[in-house]
Amino acid sequence: MPKITFMGAGSTVFAKNVLGDCMMTPALEESRIALYDIDRNRLEESALMLEAINRNNGSKAVIEKYLGVSMRKEALRGADYVVNAIQVGGYDPCTITDFEIPKKYGLRQTIADTLGVGGVFRALRTIPVMLDFARDMEEVCPDAWLLNYTNPMAMLTGAMLTMSSIRTVGLCHSVQVCAPTLLNELCMGYDDRVQVKIAGINHQAWLLECTRDGEDLYPEIKRRAKLYNEGKLEIGTWEERRAMLSNGEPLPGQWEERMKEEYDLYRKTGRHGDMVRLELMLRFGYYITESSEHNAEYTPYFIKQRYPELIGRFNIPLDEYPRRCIRQIEEWESRREELTKNPMLTHERSREYASYIMEAMETGHPVKIGGNVLNKGLITNLPQRACVEVPCMADRNGIQPTVIGDLPEQCAALNRTNINVQLMTVEAARTRKREDIYRAVMLDPHTSAELSIDDIVSMCDEMIEAHRDWMPEYS
């Protein structure tokens, strides 16, 4: 049976989803699972949780723990699949730094993990560590597949695909939830009759086609989206709204609380949490996979010192990721006992791609995914060295991406503004030149629309110094 190594196993809830999925999959349930982390306590907590799930599933898997860099190569040795979920530098201090230093220069961010100065420095902290993984993998498991879940997805996956020989695919759940989110929030409902075509780049892939029983849904989507952004779409009672957004499935308490808060906000003010994406769709013609808080900082249109009223108009949550980190830490404290000390803990297979990919490669039964891969002629009006997100087929032969051809030109043009930053950041990680970091941040759409070149250079110098313990030297 296969060996699955999970890098960053201290990401306990995510490890439960991915590895719990594997243990619930007949083709993978007898796997040898290697948990690797540099944090002893989090590693132990994840192991306790997964061992309980395994016992309640008949103890079919073998679970092993590997702590610290000295054990990394052994964790990887003989692996068939490697799942990457690391965060270099963590929330405190690195995420805090990614927000606070730019804020001194008047540059505000929402998430800062994929693009912008925050995304660039997150990549520069992470790429050297992932290349260390790659060097170990080239020695002890050269034929393994690396399934990367860590952001910034395009930068990290692109670096692995161009700077190592390791077979890598980047995975992001925003593809799976794109059409259901859009149709349910517009009260159109989502079901298995809906067919979609999605392609572009990670967090900015485009819903190119959306049909139900062959009928193009876009005309009605755009009609309702305009009403929704004007606060005029009738969304029903709270009970009706909750059932629509959840597809009738039970929700964790904290999710339901946030949905209710957003429902009340819309009823009171006409504002909601997806206004940026719907505005971009109405302007560019197509809906984008990732959330509005992300896309607010991928473009130069919404977070602007000169137009502070846009923050309220489009309901943009500045500094959202630090708040989210604090909330997740608090929620983990409340769930710790439930997940690590519950002898009856079980798991139901989630929608995360990882176990479905492994199952397809083990059994030969193909599965369609949205994967991040190198653009080798797949999207013909995007750069060939870009990391693109396209439909892929997974089976015993690995990952076979789909050729899309040209995107609508306005969609490709917006993608290219993000790709410029991604490629320049990977180049900075390769050259270790400070000037290439400056160039990556200078090319960022949001940063360049707000700051002068001199301020960008000064900000980068401060960031480099603050992150010195997590980044290699730059000349």
Regions found by a protein language model. Give the residues of each.
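An anion/phosphate-binding loop that grips the pyrophosphate of nucleotide cofactors and donors
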Residues: 79
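Long, compositionally biased stretches enriched for glycine and/or charged residues
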Residues: 190-475
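Conserved NAD(P)H cofactor-binding loop of Rossmann-fold oxidoreductase domains
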Residues: 86-89
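Rossmann-fold NAD(P)-binding glycine/threonine-rich loop
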Residues: 92-162
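Internal, well-ordered domain-core segments that constitute the primary functional module
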Residues: 133-221
